[in-house]
Structure formats: C-alpha cells, structure tokens
Amino acid sequence: MTAAEKLTVAVVYGGQSTEHSVSCISAGAIIDNLDPERFTVVPVGITNGGAWVPGATDTAQLRASGRELPTVADHGEHIQPMLGAAGEATEFRFVTGDRAGDVFATADVIFPVLHGANGEDGTIQGLFDLLGARYVGNGVLASAAGMDKEFTKKIAREAGIPTGPEVVLHGRTELTDHERELLGLPVFVKPARGGSSIGISKVDSWRDLPAAIEEAASHDPKVIIEAMITGPEVECGVLEREDGTLVASSPAMLEGTDAGEEGFYGFDAKYLDDTVSATIPAPLDEETTRRVQQLAIETYRALGCTGLARVDFFVTDAGPVLNEINTMPGFTPISMYPQMFLADGVSYADLLTTLVSGARRH
C-alpha cells in the first residue's frame, strides 16, 4: 500500500472524565498496534480541562508507571476539529499561538478512545456527527444509552434480556422499606453514568448506605443501587465486520473479583494490580457459552450499537443475567476486549483494522 493509499487515523484520547488516564493507556496500546502499512496515526489529546492538543509523540508517555497514571499535558498549543475543506476528511487546526489557523493534521477516520463522561456518553459522537466525520464505534444514541445503567437495563428488559433488580435515586439518600426488601443485602451503589468501577461501593449493612450514596453522587447526581447477583462474572466482546455481520467472542470468566480491598472488580483490580485473573474461553458448558454470546449480540442490537461493544454478565443457576454494556471498552494491554478476540485468533492489529475499516458517518 502506497503512502497515498494509507488512511490517516486520528486517535483521540484523554478527556474530561474520571477515566482520563485509562483512556491514555488505551490510546497508547492502539497507537502501538495500528498497522503502519495501512494507517498513518495522528495522536490528539484532550486535557482534563477540555483543551484539545497535539498528542504524545512517544507512547511511553501513555503508559502507567507503577501507580502513577498518565495524563494529557497542556503545553499551550491548542487545536480543534473542523469540517475539512473537501467535506470528506476532518481537519484539526491550531487555534492558539503563532500557528493559529494552520492545519495540524487531516484525518480520514477518527478513533475516539474516550471512556466515561464527555467521550463515551454520546457527547463527542454528536460533535463528530456535526462535522460529518467518519469515526470508529457507536453513535450518539447507543453511546448515551449504554453509558446510563438505568436506561441500559430498561432497554434490555424491553428486549427480553434478563437483568437484576435495581433502584435509581435522584437526590434521595435513603431507600424505602419496600426497596430494601426488593434488593436485599449486600447491594452495590454506583454512579448511574460512570465506568471503570470509579465511585462504586459494596454495602453489607444499611447503616453504610448513606456514605456509599454520597460517594456515588460525587461522581453523578443520579445513583443506581443494584442487588448482588450470585454467580461468576463473564464478559463477551461483540465486533461488527465491515459487511455488517456480528461476531461474539469467546467469553472470559473473571476470577478473584472479590479478593481485593474493594471486595469487587474495582479500579485497582482492572488496571493496577494482579488480584483478578481471567480464563478465556470461560469454563462454561457449550449451551451456556452460546447463551452468553447470543445475549451479548441481542444487547448490542437492542441498544442500536455499531462497531463494537463489550457486554458483561453474571452466570447464575437460572442462566446469564446482564450486568452492563461498554460501548467503548478498554484497550489497555490487559483489557478483556482485545484479549477475548486474541483467544479466538484475532490479533490486536487485525482487530483494530476491522474497526477502522468499518468506521462510518452516523
């Protein structure tokens, strides 16, 4: 493939989110694994303050070092995306300094590796839609619905997908007696629109509930309280090929999710330590494996997803129960989404090629 035939991919990462650093780590892995014979990569960072800046030129800057997590630095040169002159590609132009107005880069495809608020919730997808940009992944509606645990469950139930009981709080700090009876103990208290297990608490006693609600509400004014579902946690990736066909990965079973200090599959276990391991493919019987894969695809379709998703379940004695969906799953070197497809013989580079090749205007 000649240089003229290669696609230029803008990998956008960071963002105004509690998952800023996770996004940076994901972006570094993606940049390292995009096929250089097919793609020219342009890193674009978004700082915690919301400034768009030229991204890291060395992906070593996007890796965790012990417990020190990477962030997007602001060196004063700001850029912004805009519709390209030809109406096809997306331009990133300087808006500050001596080069204000000059083109920093022109991208054929945008890969928004953004997790959490202002990136995975439909907001940046709306911006790219207004620009007419081709981008990897889900559009506005699927991103917004998938980010909100309340609406994910409502849509899933309407589609006949099993879910556990939950109560949603808007400003309240207590549950009614009926709600406590419905949920039982323990419960998990979560920001309704958050990810990477940030702001989540496991509550074993009702006296600890107000503090857990306060913690979750510090991340999102809408709080969801979910009953504990008994059974192993499994994850399943969904990948949309360029021709529109959907592929469900071999599921992964997580082990040791209750071994850490948090008592559940929390942020540290996901990104900073080795208390949790995964078995891929999950040690499930053939019927349960097929059911997990079927429900993953059904959830993907119910939310109107495009490109990719990771769908998480608990496997109970009665069958799989939906936990949540991630419309832009982690792409760190240890993230489950690429690992599940790798176990099926799809390399990280081939996975990224499929995603970029299938990028579309929504």
UniProtKB/Swiss-Prot annotation:
Residue ranges annotated for the ATP-grasp domain, each copy included: 153-357
Binding-site list for ATP: 180-235
Family, per entry: Belongs to the D-alanine--D-alanine ligase family.
First-level EC class: ligase
Matching Gene3D superfamilies: 3.40.50.20, ATP-grasp fold, A domain (3.30.1490.20), ATP-grasp fold, B domain (3.30.470.20)
Name of the protein in its database record: D-alanine--D-alanine ligase
Catalytic reaction list: 2 D-alanine + ATP = D-alanyl-D-alanine + ADP + phosphate + H(+)
Free-text comment on the cofactor: Binds 2 magnesium or manganese ions per subunit.
Keywords linked to the UniProt accession: ATP-binding, Cell shape, Cell wall biogenesis/degradation, Cytoplasm, Ligase, Magnesium, Manganese, Metal-binding, Nucleotide-binding, Peptidoglycan synthesis
Binding locations of Mg(2+) 1: 312, 324
Gene that this sequence comes from: ddl
Main location: cytoplasm
Taxonomy, superkingdom: Bacteria
Cross-referenced InterPro entries: ATP-grasp, ATP_grasp_subdomain_1, D-Ala_lig_Van_CS, D_ala_D_ala, Dala_Dala_lig_C, Dala_Dala_lig_N, PreATP-grasp_dom_sf
GO biological process: cell wall organization; peptidoglycan biosynthetic process; regulation of cell shape
Free-text function comment from the UniProt entry: Cell wall formation.
UniProt binding sites for Mg(2+) 2: 324, 326
Compartments where located: Cytoplasm
GO CC terms, sorted: cytosol
Segments traversing the membrane: none
SUPFAM superfamilies recorded: Glutathione synthetase ATP-binding domain-like, PreATP-grasp domain
Record pathway: Cell wall biogenesis; peptidoglycan biosynthesis
GO molecular function: ATP binding; D-alanine-D-alanine ligase activity; metal ion binding
Cofactor(s) recorded in Swiss-Prot or TrEMBL: Mg(2+); Mn(2+)
